[in-house]
Amino acid sequence: MTAPAELSPTLQLACDLIRRPSVTPVDADCQAQMMNRLGAVGFQLEPMRIEDVDNFWATHGSQDGPVLCFAGHTDVVPTGPVQQWQHEPFEALIDADGMLCGRGAADMKGSLASMVIASERFVQDYPNHRGKVAFLITSDEEGPAHHGTKAVVERLKARNERLDWCIVGEPSSTTLLGDVVKNGRRGSLGAKLTIRGKQGHVAYPHLARNPIHLAAPALAELAAEHWDEGNAFFPPTSFQISNLNSGTGATNVVPGELTALFNFRFSTESTVEGLQARVSAILDKHELDWSVDWALSGLPFLTEPGELLDAVAASIKGVTGRDTQPSTSGGTSDGRFIATMGTQVVELGPVNATIHQVDERILASDLDLLTEIYYQTLVRLLA
């Protein structure tokens, strides 16, 4: 293990944050450590505790000019079986292969450390920079996400705060640092479908209506439906059934009801209303007795090539020598809430190969490179 004195400022802070067991929605004083450092270099700090969630908003600079915000989360997912880890999950150990090991190393305490150190350096090097550097940090990203970034964004909108550009520190890289950045995400629309039949005895099917039999053709049609073609930035919209439940557990009883959980990951070529209408039409066509409860997790968003994406790509190229690939693949992130402010949003962070897994880890040296990428992006946009 590398001795603490040998660690860079970024790695020292990353290890400090990882050693705090901030399983969602607990923050475990991670934000206090970040705010202490940001406050020491002149950031204006605004803690926002909403229900059981810790958040903070911090800014440095004048009211005039563009705003570049770093966004992220201090909460992590549970470790899973601790005995399956090679090292203690919250030990923040750098192993013989130079890997920083621990829950949150990739998702996303490493990025948080890089953001803070890059911003410290930038405001000291450019104390009179144009516009503002901002931070929007939450402890409610891995959980329900009701009282975190979403709620903070609503407060910022209510007082007419402006965010021009936002870098979310989600682990976007796939094989090498900076090989992929996320310049958008698909929308996520979930539903619980209930199809009602009539319970009865399996020996007397004429006296019952089997909801499994009734639902099967409709579900098959939904699964086979071609929802859209996608576009240059998004793949076609996908429909997936994740759960089917029916039956009493007895082998001689026709069930009276079936429930199905399904999810759309949808592109900008489809709308919530359009998808809902098409589902309703298919269910009605099969003459089912049905009801559905919809849950929208987030709308699709896209940051097209422009100032932010260009600056990030140039910084990655300058630091690593590699060309980045913009992508909209993967799940949702808090970027979906920030994008509703009309903000250009890009996700850039470490390699995501072990996120949410036992033995989460990243190459420790990547964090110093990530700090430099964030710093160079600040220089390009606000110096």
Swiss-Prot record:
A Pfam family it matches: M20_dimer
Cofactor requirement: Zn(2+); Co(2+)
Amino-acid positions noted as binding Zn(2+) 1 in the UniProt annotation, renumbered to this chain: H73, D107, E170
GO biological process terms held by the UniProt record: diaminopimelate biosynthetic process; L-arginine biosynthetic process; lysine biosynthetic process via diaminopimelate
Metabolic or biological pathway: Amino-acid biosynthesis; L-lysine biosynthesis via DAP pathway; LL-2,6-diaminopimelate from (S)-tetrahydrodipicolinate (succinylase route): step 3/3
EC number: 3.5.1.18
The reaction(s) this protein catalyses: N-succinyl-(2S,6S)-2,6-diaminopimelate + H2O = (2S,6S)-2,6-diaminopimelate + succinate
Family matches, as SUPFAM superfamilies: Bacterial exopeptidase dimerisation domain, Zn-dependent exopeptidases
Annotated keywords: Amino-acid biosynthesis, Cobalt, Diaminopimelate biosynthesis, Hydrolase, Lysine biosynthesis, Metal-binding, Zinc
Record-level Gene Ontology MF annotations: acetylornithine deacetylase activity; cobalt ion binding; succinyl-diaminopimelate desuccinylase activity; zinc ion binding
Cofactor binding summary note: Binds 2 Zn(2+) or Co(2+) ions per subunit.
Residues bound to Zn(2+) 2: D107, E142, H356
Domain of life of the native organism: Bacteria
Location of the active site: D75, E141 (proton acceptor)
Subunit and interaction comment: Homodimer.
Homology family: Belongs to the peptidase M20A family. DapE subfamily.
Listed PANTHER family: ACETYLORNITHINE DEACETYLASE, N-ACETYL-L-CITRULLINE DEACETYLASE
Entry function: Catalyzes the hydrolysis of N-succinyl-L,L-diaminopimelic acid (SDAP), forming succinate and LL-2,6-diaminopimelate (DAP), an intermediate involved in the bacterial biosynthesis of lysine and meso-diaminopimelic acid, an essential component of bacterial cell walls.
HAMAP family: DapE
Protein name, entry field: Succinyl-diaminopimelate desuccinylase
Chain's gene name: dapE
